Amino acid sequence: MEPSVGIVKTRHIDFNGDLRLESGRLLAAPITLAYETYGQLNADRSNGILVTHAWTGDAHAAGRHTPEDRKPGWWDDMIGPGKVLDTNRYFVICSNVIGSCGGSTGPTSINPRTGRPYNLSFPVIMVRDMVRAQKRLIDHLDLPSLVTVIGGSMGAMQALEWGVLFPDTVRSIIPIAGTGRTSPMAIALNALARQAIFNDPMWKKGNYRPEHPPADGLALGRAIGHISFLSNASMHLKFGRRFSARDGMFDFFGQFEVERYLEYNGRAFIDRFDTNAFLYLAKALDLYDVAWNYDSREQALDRIQCPSLWFTFSSDWLYPPQEAEDIVNILQKLGKPAEYHPIQSDYGHDSFLVEPEKFTHHITEFLNRLTV
């Protein structure tokens, strides 16, 4: 059995100050952040690493909450004794983003000004707002700086924003399978997912009861999103053109294996994620542009003062390699130390979760060059 961080607990911290959002609105206090930590702080509190999660992730990145848990945290392959993010060396933190439903303040939370759940009265948030909330946690933990901020997909956006927003705090950033701004195609896919939810009569304009969510709409919305995480090659390998039951081939409702998989994946998602949180995070993804409130991407990226390590995946069509390459090229033209590794993989956008062994040695080498 591989080394593990063992049994872990999700913690919660409430912050008393309101949070001014990029929209200009205030997110009212108390603002809760759910987080987990792995490993121990060193004497001068200089060994902290922040892990940032993707769209439907949470703070539970490694270990298990109980011995009976079927699966460990979502990045357990990466975090633990002797692993890439070595908990014998680093103090690793992962927090749930605001706007989500994993314990941090989001649309399911109680609005302190009304005493009722926010639902759609929750303000629209941006990735930059998520990062500002995370900075409060890092300050609460009394970490003067971070060795790195590392994450994939939406986590890569957060890592990049850390470099732009808090250049004096981060000593490096590692964006994986990310982009500098969300493309029209990615926005279009999210629009379809939204419409699937809006067309479910149980959605009730976001005022559904938790025990009666818009299950059909959320399942379909998730399935639409999930397709973009895969690739043509991985779907051929996993499903081919196989039917789930041969005698259903000429049954009008007979299913290919890929159909059954999408249906199962969507239905399983209902039990672990809130619909409004799904919508709010999709909106945050759509709005993402590192140049927001700057005159250009160059002006935003010139704020980064630390080395960066970038990974893309050849079959990722959600955030194609060229999108991250554009950011790396700008950084290098600005004289910033930006290291880039395009990874050959057939697993699409999810390659960073499926085949970490293809890029982790680069992370180890990169971290070894940094001072802890």
From Swiss-Prot:
List keywords of the entry alphabetically: Acyltransferase, Amino-acid biosynthesis, Cytoplasm, Methionine biosynthesis, Transferase
Its Enzyme Commission number(s) read: 2.3.1.31
Positions of the catalytic residues: 153, 316, 349
Tell me what reaction this enzyme catalyses. L-homoserine + acetyl-CoA = O-acetyl-L-homoserine + CoA
A biological process term (GO) from this entry: methionine biosynthetic process
Localisation:
Cytoplasm
InterPro entries, per the entry = AB_hydrolase_1, AB_hydrolase_fold, HAT_MetX-like
Q: Which Pfam families match?
A: Abhydrolase_1
The UniProt record gives the binding positions of substrate as 222, 350
What pathway is it annotated to?
Answer: Amino-acid biosynthesis; L-methionine biosynthesis via de novo pathway; O-acetyl-L-homoserine from L-homoserine: step 1/1
Q: Which residue intervals define the domain AB hydrolase-1 in the entry?
A: 49-356
Give GO MF terms, alphabetically: homoserine O-acetyltransferase activity
Q: GO cellular component terms?
A: cytoplasm
Main location class = cytoplasm
Recorded family membership: Belongs to the AB hydrolase superfamily. MetX family.
**What does this gene product do?**
Transfers an acetyl group from acetyl-CoA to L-homoserine, forming acetyl-L-homoserine.
Describe the protein's quaternary organization and the partners it interacts with: Homodimer.
Protein name as catalogued: Homoserine O-acetyltransferase
Its source organism is Syntrophotalea carbinolica (strain DSM 2380 / NBRC 103641 / GraBd1) (Pelobacter carbinolicus)
